[in-house]
Regions:
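Structured alpha-helical segments in the cores of large, soluble enzyme domains
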Residues: 91-100, 137-144, 173-185, 287-294, ...
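A short acidic (Asp/Glu
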Residues: 24-25, 120-125, 162-166, 203-212, ...
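Long, repeat-rich segments with strong aromatic
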Residues: 284-319, 323
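Active-site beta->alpha N-cap acidic-glycine motif
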Residues: 2-141
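Metal-dependent polysaccharide deacetylase catalytic core of the NodB/CE4 family, i.e.
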Residues: 109-201, 305, 340
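Short acidic, S/G/P-rich loop/turn micro-motifs used as interaction or catalytic elements
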Residues: 19-22, 116-121, 160, 278-283, ...
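Conserved small/polar residues in nucleotide/adenosyl-binding loops
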Residues: 354-356
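Active-site-adjacent pocket scaffolds in enzyme catalytic domains
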Residues: 2-46, 55, 123, 186-190, ...
């Protein structure tokens, strides 16, 4: 028996919003800047460089603009060959073993795959169609023998005007949600157990829908809002991804019927997952320390973090596991393990595995 198995355990869950390739033109970047911060500038490479460096004085919005236009955020995998080039390395045993957990096991990835359907305009050149992304990753996992990885479900509701680059929140007005799930059952003999909300956004209609179908929800990204985040109109004040009232101590919870953000008597369990490699609600060293401290106190804990496959995730993986290693040194009594989302939920909740 490995002696570390007698220690308190922290389950580290890498959640990937799996959306396939994404392209964004220079003009679209400046349009997004205007929508987020109400900054209207003539698109240009030199202007973008000055925003990124902070040379362009935009008053109290300077840092917000730098966050929206950060170089890493704009380095998109804009084709399947680029995505696959990244995956070929990340899914290899050699790469996984660069980040061993307390038991020496390599990292595990959780692919929350979505369908790009329900829109007529596709300026970001998404791979449109049911099961396209699901099938691509399922085949890739089989090719590489990624037996520890898990495949799950991710959804972005359709915009009212059927524009693929516009974020929306209404599940009631997104019939492709039901068809996407039905196709997974009928065409692939598969149904998800874990879910992540697009743009981290839930509201009453999605809350009650999820309650009927998904036992495990990894959408909570509650954290204190920074000044840079609060000035961004699309995310500030809970506009998208409102988890301001939700637990931010890495505790999991059954939500209330009337408010998905507070503990109650609903059946599904919501877990926390903070973001990396983006412009909001970022995982910090203090967050990782808090997860280790909770586990050290004997409380079953899952530390979730999330990013997107349309960016180079290797930088994110390196950054997160550097933080994990530092925390592990502070809490030597804690055994930390890479985990699938479903497996972590089962273990944290002490659920028995039932074969049907």
């Amino acid at each position: 028996m490995n002696p570390v198995q007698d220690k308190p355990t922290l389950f580290v869950v890498h959640c990937i919003d799996t959306e396939g390739p994404l392209s964004e033109s220079l003009e679209a970047t400046f349009e997004r800047l205007e929508n987020s911060l109400d900054i209207r500038l003539k698109p240009g490479r030199e202007t973008l460089r000055r925003i990124q460096s902070g040379e362009l004085n935009l008053g109290d919005k300077t840092e917000g603009a730098r966050a929206v236009c950060a170089p890493h955020n704009l380095e998109y995998n804009d084709s399947w060959p680029k995505v696959d080039s990244m995956l070929d390395e990340m899914l290899s045993l050699e790469y996984r073993q660069r980040f061993p957990d307390s038991e020496g096991h390599g990292c595990i990835f959780n692919w929350f795959a979505m369908d790009h359907v329900g829109f007529d305009e596709n300026p970001r050149l998404r791979d449109v169609g049911y099961l396209n992304i699901f099938d691509h990753y399922r085949e890739k996992m089989q090719e590489t023998g990624a037996n520890g990885d898990e495949l799950h479900f991710h959804l972005h509701p359709a915009s009212t005007y059927r524009q693929g680059h516009i974020s929306a929140t209404s599940y009631l007005r997104s019939p492709h949600l039901l068809e996407g799930l039905a196709r997974r059952i009928v065409d692939r003999t598969w149904f998800p157990s874990c879910f992540r909300a697009g743009f981290y956004t839930e509201r009453p209609d999605s809350h009650w829908f999820l309650e009927q179908w998904f036992p495990f929800d990894f959408s909570n990204n509650a954290t204190s809002e920074s000044a840079t985040e609060s000035m961004q109109q699309d995310i500030g004040g809970g506009r998208f991804g409102d988890w301001r009232r939700a637990p931010d101590d890495w505790s999991h919870y059954h939500p209330s019927h009337d408010d998905y953000q507070i503990p109650g008597n609903c059946r599904r369990t919501i877990f926390r997952a903070l973001t990396v490699g983006t412009r909001m609600r970022l995982l910090k060293q203090s967050d990782v320390d808090a997860a280790f401290a909770r586990a050290s106190a004997g409380k079953p804990t899952a530390l979730g973090f999330s990013d997107h496959d349309f960016r180079d995730m290797r930088k994110d993986v390196e950054a997160v596991y550097s933080m994990v290693r530092r925390s592990a040194e502070k809490f030597p009594n804690v055994r930390w393990v890479h985990s699938g989302a479903r497996d972590a939920a089962r273990r944290v909740l002490d659920l028995s595995l039932i074969h049907i």
